[in-house]
Swiss-Prot record:
Protein name in the entry: N-acetylmuramic acid 6-phosphate etherase
Keywords recorded for this protein, A-Z: Carbohydrate metabolism, Lyase
Organism annotation: Mycolicibacterium smegmatis (strain ATCC 700084 / mc(2)155)
Pfam families: GKRP_SIS_N (PF22645)
Note: A lyase-type mechanism (elimination/hydration) is suggested for the cleavage of the lactyl ether bond of MurNAc 6-phosphate, with the formation of an alpha,beta-unsaturated aldehyde intermediate with (E)-stereochemistry, followed by the syn addition of water to give product.
Function, as annotated: Specifically catalyzes the cleavage of the D-lactyl ether substituent of MurNAc 6-phosphate, producing GlcNAc 6-phosphate and D-lactate.
Lineage: Bacteria, Bacillati, Actinomycetota, Actinomycetes, Mycobacteriales
Lyase recorded as keyword: yes
PANTHER family documented for this protein: GLUCOKINASE REGULATORY PROTEIN
Length: 298
């Protein structure tokens, strides 16, 4: 596989003397390069939005968001997946991260795993990929065999497919219903796509999961109302969320949370609509999780 023509593998003309720079100079040039990433992501907001629609529809019908990748790209997808349960109250199987070489490859690289497209098919089959799911393949180069094979297999299973790459005309784009190509250009350190490309992939994943969860009613204003108080930090956060959402006194918020089994959304509906925890839960279910609809559904 010839990668020499890829922009992410090219030499950055602004950093050819990287080893001669002072530490302040080196950090400044890295920061300057990083500042270009947000602009590159902004250029593909339409494609990101289209992917959000696919993901939201999958989650609404009981399907999953499945990230698929190798190396840094796979780790970024896995990182976003594992953050969804504590942030949005999802179950661990609603947002899934598949990493070539398995979970152990997050810490220790599994040599050659990314070059085996059949591994992705096996990994997807192991979790029962179906037409209800959206599979997001991450590959900075746009050519990783594991990701190409995974997207092909997901399509064959009827799943919606999204690709994220950092080169134009990426191979993975051919197998995606929505192709996201964030053109981050040559890296500060030649070929080290854990830098700008990795940052871009993380930004896109942040958008995909967060925007989808907002659409699903897991956010009220800008507050994480589906979070459950499972540790000391979250107990305090959930109490503050209820207070800020309703204007209730902290003691009143605590009483509502106790009745709501620590669930912020239920406590908010209880206080805002003046109803019991059971009635709040019923309202939320009838409203499909949308808190504003639940409050007004008297």
């Amino acid at each position: 596989m010839d990668l020499s023509a890829l922009e992410t593998e090219g030499r950055n003309t602004r950093t050819t003397e990287l080893d001669r720079l002072t530490v302040p100079e080196l950090l400044a040039v890295m920061n300057d390069e990083d500042r270009t990433v947000a602009s590159a992501v902004r250029d593909v907001l339409d494609q990101i939005g289209a992917a959000v629609e696919l993901i939201t529809e999958s989650l609404r019908r009981g399907g999953r968001l499945i990230y698929l990748g190798a190396g840094t790209s796979g780790r970024i997808g896995l990182l976003d997946a594992v953050e969804c349960p504590p942030t949005f109250g999802t179950t661990p199987d609603q947002v899934v991260g598949l990493l070539s070489g398995g979970p152990g490859a997050f810490v220790t690289a599994v040599e050659g795993a990314e070059d085996q497209p059949e591994r992705a098919a096996d990994d997807l089959d192991a979790i029962g990929v179906s037409a209800d799911d959206t599979v997001v393949g991450l590959a900075a180069s746009g050519r990783t065999p594991y990701v190409v094979g995974g997207l092909q297999h997901a399509r064959g299973a009827g799943a919606a497919t999204v690709s994220i790459a950092c080169n134009r005309d990426a191979l993975v784009s051919r197998y995606a219903d929505v192709a996201i190509e964030v053109l981050t250009g040559p890296e500060v350190l030649t070929g080290s796509t854990r830098l700008k490309a990795g940052t871009a992939e993380k930004m896109v994943c942040n958008m995909l999961s967060t925007a989808s969860m907002v659409r699903l009613g897991k956010v009220y204003g800008n507050l994480m109302v589906d979070v459950r108080a499972t540790n000391g930090k979250l107990v305090d956060r959930v109490r503050r969320i209820v207070v800020e959402s309703t204007g209730a006194e902290p003691e009143t918020a605590e009483q509502a949370l106790a009745a709501a089994d620590g669930h912020a959304k239920t406590a908010i509906v209880m206080l805002a609509a003046g109803c019991s925890a059971d009635e709040a839960a019923r309202r939320i279910e009838r409203a499909g999780g949308d808190i504003r609809t639940a409050i007004g559904a008297g």
